[in-house]
């Protein structure tokens, strides 16, 4: 009888030890719960930083008209500083040229994959850069903003060939995919309106969460803007603390100074460099125009625009 009681006690102690061990293991955070808040509420959203930046082509007579340092080689350190300050995960660039490939790309290519999309009739291109360690490239696409988008062409009153280019990316942190698109619309009135509709409709009809950004050559006061915000969301209007300033500066040091009525003194009161997103697809956490000089100099005749956003479930 004593032997039986002793054996039973040993078994009970062993069972208790096992329960404690497995109970402790079961309480450890898993990969799925590690990012959750401590009160078992929803996890913090996984955000990424997105920038659009017209870096300006090199024009031979700019040194006479505007500033003495306006070559891409001179401006490259300033461009790179703006990029470093924002540290974008995805960067869409307009007016990228061979000069930028030589002077800017070497400092970025270790961290970023650089995809350049040629317009076809001119030396400038659109470029999309994304961090190699953060994103996986699934596919790319581009088409011309014309009545024959499948071939290099221009229509209506357009002065230049214009394109839309995009990448479909998978975020390795969230395992979500999204489309990042960019463009640079013409200045001609009819063409600009037609091109705007093409890129806005394409973004709205995307099967994935989609962004379209770039130099639209119009701001929020223009009638062309209404169709954009009736179809997509403007990131600038989705946050309460958005920077209120122009993105185009024209190498005018007063370009970022506001009058009492909110208009910029050089006549440009709102950004023409836009970031639109597909409705209900993203949450925008911040919006900024990097409207400052570097060492007293302009990096471009445009300031970069930066947003932080997350993809909705």
Regions found by a protein language model. Name each.
Residues 1-14:
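Positively charged n-region of N-terminal signal peptides that target proteins for export
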Residues 13-23:
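Bacterial N-terminal signal peptides
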Residues 26-106, 311-313:
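N-terminal, active-site-proximal structural segment of metallo-dependent hydrolase catalytic domains
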Residues 55-58, 96-100, 119-123, 134-135, ...:
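Solvent-exposed loop/turn segments at secondary-structure junctions
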Residues 90, 94-178, 289:
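Structured beta-strand-rich core segments of catalytic domains in phosphoester-bond hydrolases
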Residues 189-190, 201-210, 218-313:
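Metal-dependent phosphoester-hydrolase catalytic domains
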């Amino acid at each position: 009888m004593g032997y039986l009681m002793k054996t039973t006690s040993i078994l009970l102690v062993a069972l208790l030890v096992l329960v404690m061990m497995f109970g402790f293991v079961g309480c450890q955070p898993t990969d799925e719960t590690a990012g959750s808040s401590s009160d078992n509420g929803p996890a913090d959203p996984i955000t990424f930083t997105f920038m659009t930046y017209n870096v300006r082509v090199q024009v031979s007579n700019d040194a006479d008209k505007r500033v003495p340092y306006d070559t891409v080689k001179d401006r490259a350190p300033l461009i790179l500083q703006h990029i470093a300050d924002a540290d974008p995960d995805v960067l869409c660039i307009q007016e990228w040229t061979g000069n930028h490939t030589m002077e800017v790309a070497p400092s970025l290519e270790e961290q970023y994959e650089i995809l350049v999309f040629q317009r076809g009739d001119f030396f400038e291109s659109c470029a999309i850069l994304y961090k190699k360690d953060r994103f996986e490239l699934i596919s790319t696409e581009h088409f011309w903003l014309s009545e024959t988008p499948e071939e290099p062409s221009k229509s209506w009153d357009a002065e230049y060939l214009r394109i839309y280019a995009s990448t479909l990316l998978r975020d390795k942190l969230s395992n979500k995919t999204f489309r990042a698109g960019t463009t640079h619309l013409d200045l001609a009135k009819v063409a600009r309106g037609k091109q705007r509709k093409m890129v806005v409709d394409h973004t709205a009809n995307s099967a994935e969460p989609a962004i379209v950004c770039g130099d639209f050559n119009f701001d929020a006061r223009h009638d062309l803007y209404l169709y954009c915000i009736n179809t997509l969301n403007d990131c600038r209007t989705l946050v309460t603390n958005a920077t209120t300033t122009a993105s185009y500066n024209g190498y005018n040091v007063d370009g970022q100074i506001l009058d009492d009525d909110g208009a910029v003194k050089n006549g440009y009161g709102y950004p023409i460099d836009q970031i639109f997103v597909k409705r209900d697809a993203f949450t925008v956490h911040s919006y900024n125009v990097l409207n400052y000089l570097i060492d007293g100099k302009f990096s471009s005749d445009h300031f970069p625009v930066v947003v932080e956003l997350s993809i909705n479930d």
